[in-house]
Structure formats: C-alpha cells, structure tokens
Amino acid sequence: MGGCFSKPKPVELKIEVVLPEKERGKEELSASGKGSPRAYQGNGTARHFHTEERLSTPHPYPSPQDCVEAAVCHVKDLENGQMREVELGWGKVLLVKDNGEFHALGHKCPHYGAPLVKGVLSRGRVRCPWHGACFNISTGDLEDFPGLDSLHKFQVKIEKEKVYVRASKQALQLQRRTKVMAKCISPSAGYSSSTNVLIVGAGAAGLVCAETLRQEGFSDRIVLCTLDRHLPYDRPKLSKSLDTQPEQLALRPKEFFRAYGIEVLTEAQVVTVDVRTKKVVFKDGFKLEYSKLLLAPGSSPKTLSCKGKEVENVFTIRTPEDANRVVRLARGRNVVVVGAGFLGMEVAAYLTEKAHSVSVVELEETPFRRFLGERVGRALMKMFENNRVKFYMQTEVSELRGQEGKLKEVVLKSSKVVRADVCVVGIGAVPATGFLRQSGIGLDSRGFIPVNKMMQTNVPGVFAAGDAVTFPLAWRNNRKVNIPHWQMAHAQGRVAAQNMLAQEAEMSTVPYLWTAMFGKSLRYAGYGEGFDDVIIQGDLEELKFVAFYTKGDEVIAVASMNYDPIVSKVAEVLASGRAIRKREVELFVLHSKTGDMSWLTGKGS
C-alpha cells in the first residue's frame, strides 16, 4: 500500500490516478496534432489516452427527429399541487402542476429508480418516497440527497387548453442528468507535489465534495485519496447485497473522473497531516501540499476482543471483498452474526436463503431497541424468526473456538455454545481519525472531528464531513450530533465544497435513512436520540405501520414500513422549519385516518 506518485513497489503499490482531458489548445497538441492528456500509473510514469478513450458529449440541442412531442392532458386535469405520470411514446414523464404552472421532469429518482409520482410535492420540489432525495421542479436539479444526478427538465407548452410536452428521446430513456461541470485546467495537475484541494476519503462525502467543486466552476486541481482499492462505490449495498461485485457498486465510471479532472489515488493511506505547512504525508513517505483540505476518512468497524479472536472466518464488513468472501463461505454453512443493529440484521436477512443456519447474538433485549423502540424492535425480530433466524439476546461472545485454525463454535457468556463456520461482527464503528491525533485539528474525547454548520474544523482551510464528524443539527437547536448516514455524508460533502469556495452555505438537511430486509423496506427520518414515547399507527404484526418518536411535546423522528410516503412527508415538514406536535399525532392515530396526511400540511382532511 502506498501514496501517490511514489517510487514503484510492484507488489504493494496500487494507485488509480485519473487525470483530466485538458482543453484543446495549440500548446497541448502532440506531434500527431491530437490532444494528449496523460495519467500517472502506479510506477509514476505517464501514459497517453487514446482517441477512442475520450468521452463523447451529446449535442445540447437535439434535432427534431431526436425529439418527441405530444399532448399529455387537458389543463384542468390536474389541480395545483398534483403530480401525474404521463406517457410520451419513448418513455414516461412526471407532470407537475404547481402555482398554476406545469412542469415536466424525469419520472424516476436517479438514485434507485423510485417512482417520483408517489413522492411528496412541497415548496417547489418533489421528494423521493423511498430515500428522501429532493429535486427542483423548475430545473430538475438535485437539491437534497442521496444520489448524484439530477432529473431532465422537459419543455411544456399550452395550446387550446391542452398541455404539450416535448422531450429528447435519449433523455426519456436515460432518466438522469449529470450537472454541467468544469474541467481541470491547472497546468501542474499530475506533475506536482501540490494540489489546490485534497480530499481524504472517497466515500459519499468525498465524492460529492469533488463533484460540487466542479459543478460550481472550480477548475483547479482536485486529488481524492482513499484506502480502498476501488473508485467510489455504493457502500450501503455491502450489507444488503453481499455478493454484488465491485464493478456493479461503482458510483461513477473511470471515464467520469478522467473527463472532469478528478484524480483518484487508491490504496493511499495518509499517516500525518501538518496544518502549519499544509502538507499530508502518505504511508510510503510521499508528501502532498494542499490549499484546502477535506477530511472524510469515515469509520473503522469494531472487532471482538474475546478469546480465540484470531481464528479464521471471522469478519467485519468494510469492503466489497469482505462482503463477497462472507457470502461465498456462508453457503450451506452455519453463520453467527454478532450485533443486531442495521448492518448485522441486514447481513442476517441476506444470508438466510444461502446459509444452513443464521443466528444473531445481541446484548440488548430486542433488535434496534435504542433506535426504534421496544415494540417496533419486537415486530422486526418476529419477522426474522419467521425466516428461520435464531436469536440469543442479552448476552455476548466470550470465546471463538476453532478447529485447524478455522471457526467452529461461538461460546456465549450465557454458557450457550453455537455452531458457527462463519461469524460476521457488526457491533459498531469508531472514527478513523487516528492519523490526526498530533495534527492540531480538533478531536473530541471519542475521536470525532467537531465542525461548525459550514463543515469547518478549528483550523482555517480544513473541512471535515461524513461518519467521522460531529456537527450542529439545525432543526434540533444546533445540538452537536454524529449521524453516520449515507444521505447525511452527501449533504456534508456539498456544504464543505461550497464553503471552500466562500459561499457561506450551512447544513440544514433532515437526516433520512433506510434499510431493506426480506424484501421489506423500513424508512426513517429525523433524529430520535432521547425519545421518551413512541406513537404507532397501523399494524405492527402485519408490518404496515408508522411510528412517531416524540420527546416532550415534539415529534423528533418517524419510521415506517409499507406506509409510503409518510416518512418523506414528515421529512419535508421538518425541513420547512415547522414543528410537529405530539397532540397532532395523537389525534391522527385516534381518528385512524390511515393514509391521510393532510394534517401535516395544515390543509385539513
């Protein structure tokens, strides 16, 4: 493992450095008269990209034969605040009527393909019903996360009381749009030991920071470094779909980074940061100067410290290779999952159809108790038991026993011995900030990096985002919190980038997360730590419910299964700054207005 541009180490050094395709100019042409952008390989030498490797850019104004136009409805067919999916021959379009105006957009969320017509329309944007991403209905732009791409916006005209939509056939089929981005024009890119922006960590926060800089017109050098051997990938899928291959998880193809001049250093470990000289040092000794620094190192999974911890086939899930190996070894074997949090339960659910047996060991009385409460936790536990998962609650692992070096049994403190060929440990994580201890960058007692609303650390020019930070949560009276959610990391990465450019942006996102188990999705919005009551509407046994988490007189979080789009609705209300009172929820449940959420907007029913 090593840093960037270092001397060759044939076995250990693996670097993925992707450089920009420079603007064509006379001084940049090769002897053949063709532009010759270069990329550094693992040994520090340069190679030329061939013409066929270049990205093709579609013409921004499609010819008439590439477009389709049709009348999709009468002007009176939609009321203000309504949405409808309409067919346009080559694909569907989301038609929206808001404040008397019609808007036509892509109909699927670019994140995971949710039908936006089932989402929430509010304040000039539509919020995805599945994961909470928000899109501006006037532009199609992504305004809140998760996800990277925006929606296509189509032309609308009114003639003789009919609504016509015109769209390119290609846009109808793609259903996603990458924002216009700058390219790197820095003459030193790839040749210098300095960079304008260095991003440590290539998860959601790091990638969104880099993309936001380019979207805002930043054309200087950006270096993104990661401990992973892969380009940025969809990490939440690791525990939900363990046999997904790395190339299927990629958030952007290699050509994307090349096109927009975002250099990616893989398997590059930062060991020290010197804020006085603005230099970072990599494990192989290479030093890189920066002007602005984003720290997004993420977290490291906790491991077991019991007797026998060195036996083989005991895993944490941190990389695609970890996940792939677990599912390969688990087929037809006995699996023990330690920890009944989101990661552990997702892994257990996924392996039930592949393993001979799946057992879960947990210190609490019920899964998710601290996060979702006793009643919801028990309902989910029953769902797992109905799918042949065995639980060992209120105990922990005291010993891992092996045979010929490989795991054979898990011994619990309750004295129970559980057969196990594979053990997956999901007992939480700690911030991966050890390399910052002597840097002068502030860390709290748990190792998290405290930041302000603008994602700034205590050191000027140094920002932090993602799982390793604590930040003030605006709608919870700026309470300092750590929220290791995929969606939150996206938002923090964008705010950090905006403030690198002195835009004075602040974090205002409402946390939104989701999990999937046995084909059922649970959605959650808000920040429920410290809740003192849970109000449930629906049927827990049927797993069709919404749970409101309250503290005092205020709703601070909501969770649901088979009750869409109520979580997105609540998230939108909280994002607007309006508090939801406990009494409102109690009346909602009392009158059993199942599915009716008009009370949230104050419109009545």
UniProtKB/Swiss-Prot annotation:
It is an enzyme of class 1 (oxidoreductase). It comes from the Eukaryota. The gene is AIFM3. It is found in: Mitochondrion. Ubiquitous. Expressed in bone marrow, cerebral cortex, liver, ovary, thymus, thyroid gland and tongue (at protein level). This is Apoptosis-inducing factor 3. Residues 70-165 form the Rieske domain. InterPro entries: FAD-oxidoreductase/Apoptosis (IPR050446), FAD/NAD-bd_sf (IPR036188), FAD/NAD-binding_dom (IPR023753), FAD/NAD-linked_Rdtase_dimer_sf (IPR016156), Reductase_C (IPR028202), Rieske_2Fe-2S (IPR017941), Rieske_2Fe-2S_sf (IPR036922). Keywords: 2Fe-2S, Apoptosis, Electron transport, FAD, Flavoprotein, Iron, Iron-sulfur, Metal-binding, Mitochondrion, Oxidoreductase, Transport. GO terms for molecular function: 2 iron, 2 sulfur cluster binding; metal ion binding; oxidoreductase activity, acting on NAD(P)H. GO terms for biological process: execution phase of apoptosis. The lineage of its organism: Eukaryota, Metazoa, Chordata, Craniata, Vertebrata. The keyword Transport applies.
